[in-house]
Structure formats: C-alpha cells, structure tokens
Amino acid sequence: MDARRARQKDCRAKKNFKKFRYVKLISMETPSSSDDSCDSFASDNFANTRLQANREGCRTRSQCTRSGPLRVAMKFPPRSTRGAANKRTVPPEPPENSVTDSNSDSEDESGMNFLEKRALNIKQNKAMLAKLMSELESFPGSFPGRRSLPGPSSRPKTPRRRTFPGVACRRNPERRARPLTRSRSRVLGSLSALPTEEEEEEEEEEDKYMLVRKRKSMVGYMNEDDMPRSRRPGPMTLPHVVRPVDEITEEELENICNNSREKIYNRSLGSTCHQCRQKTIDTKTNCRNPECWGVRGQFCGPCLRNRYGEEVKDALLDPNWHCPPCRGICNCSFCRQRDGRCATGVLVYLAKYHGFGNVHAYLKSLKQEFEMQG
C-alpha cells in the first residue's frame, strides 16, 4: 500500500511540474537594486509583470469579497445623463460673420445719428445767436462806440499833437522817432533842447557809424549848473588827492603791473581801475588835474598801454599828466555810453591786426576816415 501511494504522489508531482513550465519567471526585488544600475527592475520589464500580477490579484479579491452592491453617501448620476445635461447648458454659438455685420450696422447707425444731432445743434445755436445779436443791436445805447449805419465823416482829421510842445512838426509822421532814453537825455539836456527833424535825419544817417559817432558839442554848458548831471561829482564821491612826483617811491614803480596775469585782486586793500573796473593791489596812475574827482584818474598798466598807448611809470613821473577822461579821449564803456556811443569791447586785437598799437589810435583813424567820406 505504501509503495502504491508513493507512486501516485510521484505522478501527481510530475503533472504539477508540467503545469509550472508555462508560468513566467518573476525576478525578486532586492534592496541593492537602483535606477542607476543596469540590474534594475525597469530594465527587466518587471514593472509590467508586477502590474499584471496586481490586476489578477485584484480580480480574485473582488470576486471573493463581492457580496453586495457598494453603498456611498451621495450617488452620482450615470454618464449618459451627465453628458446630456452639459449639452443642454451650453447655448449654440452664432456664426462670427453675423456678429460683425450686426456690430458694423449698429456703429454706422450711431455715427449717422451723432452727425445729424450735431448739425441740428449747430443750426439751433446759430439761430439763437443771430436772434440775440439782433435784439442787442435794436437797443440804442448798447454799443456807444459803434453805429448801426456809419455815415461819411464830415470833420477833417486833425494831426495828432506831439508830446513835446517845443519840437517842430514832422513831415513824415508815420516814421517813429528814437526813444528819449536816460543816456540821450544826458547828451541832449532838457526837453526844450530836443533836436529838430533835420537833425534827427542826420542822426539816422550816422547811426550806421555808431562806433565813432561825433559827440554833441559842449559849447552851451557855460557854468556848472548847465553841465549834465553825469559830469558833476556826487555826494559820495571820494576826494581827489593830487600826489606830487616827489612822493612816488621806487616800490610803487616796481609794483606797476605790466601784464593782466600779474594782477592780484583784493577788494579791501586794492584800488579800482577806471577802464576795467577791477580792484587790484598794483600801482595805478594819478591825475594831476585838480578838477578831477574820485577814482576817475586811476588806470592800471595793461589798460593804459592797450587803450591809449601810454605807460603808468611815465604818467606817475610827469607832473602835468592828465587822465583820459579829463582830456576827453576816454573810450571805456561808461564814458562812451554817456556820450551816446556804444561800447567797443575787446578791440585791442582788432586794432593790432590793422597795424595800430592801441585802441585810441584805431578809433581816431576810423573817425578821420568817415569824416573824409562825409
């Protein structure tokens, strides 16, 4: 009996082994496997086999554990009903062409309505304005300076009176005269001595030669009261001190500035040059004219040389030396403006270009040339 049973067991084992031949081999997962190595499960198609095994296991579990229907708190509608509901909620979209056509039609209609309303408003406003103007013109005293029917004026037009009674009438009233400025009033004097029309014409002809225009004669100024206001010293003018030649020291002669670069500016201890108006500590000239006043006779070395061709040392050692303003040849901007002339500016380079050593000689030659032409 025992041998028989053993044979039956061997036969059963062989049959089971034959069935096991057709089962796929599954590699076991080890902790040493990783994605970086070539022996990973992904390279052996292990993931697919594992998913299939899980699906088969799930099927068997569901078949074993399925005892009744699944109960949940809220039941979802079936797929067919949900699709129908979504289709009902979405409205049908109209074609794009119809939308654009309707928009363009509405815009054209609104534009036409706006233009019509605008034209109507303009027409109404014009009518209202014309009505108001007609009502205003109907009143007699509404526009005092304006007449409804202006008639021809019978009164002859009288010539306009001049502002200055002592001046002769102009033959050409349309031409405007030069304005009476402060500088012109100094030259011309009072209002009674204003020039006549012929003199103004001569002045206009000489305007193109403003640089060397002739100065008005000072013959009429006989006494001090008749002198212009600018020729009299003011109350704040410094007293003029005439220094004799014996008081001039060698230190002062050595302190004479020969170049503008050698100037040292000092507003508390320096002295002012009449020409350049700069306050420096170098030695200036001293006018020996007792009637001179203030700092009018003080000239620095560069200004006296470039403007008048003289030296400060010679002027200090000359007991009869008079400053250019006292001689009437000063060409600084203040003196020229007082005489009715324009300022020359930096004219020394132009004078040297034409062969003259100083500005005074160049202006004198220009004046002689224009007098010969006239």
Curated annotation (Swiss-Prot):
RNA-binding listed as a keyword: no
Residues recorded with modification Phosphothreonine: 163, 196
GO biological process per UniProt: apoptotic process; regulation of DNA-templated transcription
Biased composition (Acidic residues): 196-207
Membrane-traversing stretches: none
Short motif Nuclear localization signal, span: 160-176
Cross-link (Glycyl lysine isopeptide (Lys-Gly) (interchain with G-Cter in SUMO2)): 208
Region (Interaction with MYC): 146-170
Assembly, per entry: Interacts with MYC (via C-terminus), YWHAE and YWHAZ.
UniProt protein name: Cell division cycle-associated protein 7
Species, as recorded: Bos taurus (Bovine)
